[in-house]
């Protein structure tokens, strides 16, 4: 991952140094040394700060001329078997990708699962969460324009993204590389445990 992604950012609230310490250990495990901490924008409600934080990183990456950017949230944790999945999936990613999700959650009520674009890549049609995803540099300007058009609509950033999937090349790595660690969510204000891999397998299996 270190060599594939041009820029890597981790969104972290100033009041959560514990999470920054924890995610650094995760990245060290993956031999990622160039990740940069991005101080999360604190707002009330918290999801607004999340929205603005992601937008700010997109704008910074575009301004820096990034070839691509990987954005992580500070509760992203690697699956123990992430490496074989990454080694396989990176060979299957075409050069014309727009977004790649390294972790995601699917609608459990979905009647139409995301199709496989390759053995280790799903062509996403409906996925949520923003704890681990990447954006191709060529798509940054269009994505920024689209996200800015959603300001004031009271729609969380992950939903804003997902509504664009039908028009772009958005892929999900399968099996996933990152999950969102169970624990207290500063955005939702409660303890969460999304059981990501179980969720994705459930949706894929029930629709086969």
Task: Describe every region a protein language model picked out.
Residues 1-72, 76-208:
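An acidic/histidine-cluster motif and surrounding catalytic segment
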